[in-house]
C-alpha cells in the first residue's frame, strides 16, 4: 500500500509484489490528506486516517472503504491491528481534549470505548501473543516547582500501561462482552 498524487489528489494505491503488477487505486476523488497506512496481520485489510479526522478500514480484495470512527477535536493518528486481525485499537480525542482508547471489531462492525477521557491515553499496541493491550497515558502527576518560571509543572507524566485480554486474545475484558 502506498499513497500517490498521480490523479491530482492524494490517494491510496495497492501494488501486488510481483513482476509486471499494475497499481490498483483504492480511494477516489478524495481531497483529504491521508496519514500512514497499516496492514492487517493477514494482509486482508489496511487502515489509515485522514485530515477529516476519520479512521478508515479498507478491504484489500474488494477495495471497499468502511468508516471506523470520526474524531471531533484532533486527527486520529494512533491505530493498530490485533494479532488475529479482527480488532483495531486506536486513540481518539474527546470534547475535553483528552484522548481515550477505543476498539473496533471488524467481524461485527462494533466499536467500544475502553478507557475514559480523564487522562490522555494513546499509542495502543497489542502484545505479540494477543494477551495484552499496551498504551501510553499521561496520568502520573509528578508535581514539581520550576526553577525558571516560578510556577508548578508536571514532570514525567507519561507511563506505559497494560490492559489484560482474555486467553484467546479476541475479546477485551472486562470492557467488551
Residue positions per predicted region:
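Multi-bladed beta-propeller domains
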Residues: 4, 13-35, 58-77, 92-94, ...
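Loop/turn residues immediately N-terminal
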Residues: 53-54
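Loop/turn-rich, solvent-exposed surfaces of beta-rich toroidal or solenoidal domains
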Residues: 81, 87-99
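Hydrophobic beta-strand positions that form the internal "hydrophobic ladder"
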Residues: 1, 43-46, 85-88, 133
Amino acid at each position: 500500500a502506498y499513497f500517490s498524487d498521480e490523479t491530482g489528489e492524494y490517494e491510496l494505491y495497492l501494488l501486488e509484489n510481483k513482476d509486471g503488477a499494475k497499481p490498483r487505486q483504492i480511494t477516489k476523488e478524495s481531497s483529504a490528506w491521508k496519514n500512514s497506512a497499516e496492514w492487517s496481520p493477514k494482509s486482508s485489510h489496511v487502515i489509515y486516517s485522514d485530515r477529516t479526522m476519520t479512521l478508515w478500514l479498507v478491504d484489500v480484495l474488494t477495495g471497499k472503504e468502511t468508516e471506523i470512527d470520526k474524531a471531533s477535536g484532533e486527527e486520529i493518528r494512533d491505530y493498530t491491528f490485533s494479532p488475529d486481525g479482527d480488532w483495531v485499537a486506536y486513540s481518539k480525542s474527546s470534547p475535553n481534549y483528552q484522548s481515550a482508547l477505543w476498539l473496533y471489531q471488524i467481524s461485527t462492525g462494533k466499536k467500544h470505548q475502553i478507557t475514559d477521557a480523564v487522562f490522555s491515553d494513546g499509542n495502543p499496541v497489542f502484545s505479540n501473543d494477543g494477551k495484552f493491550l499496551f498504551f501510553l497515558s499521561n496520568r502520573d502527576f509528578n508535581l514539581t516547582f520550576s526553577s525558571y518560571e516560578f510556577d508548578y509543572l508536571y514532570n514525567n507524566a507519561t507511563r506505559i500501561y497494560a490492559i489484560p485480554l482474555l486467553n484467546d486474545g479476541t475479546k477485551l475484558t472486562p470492557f467488551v462482552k
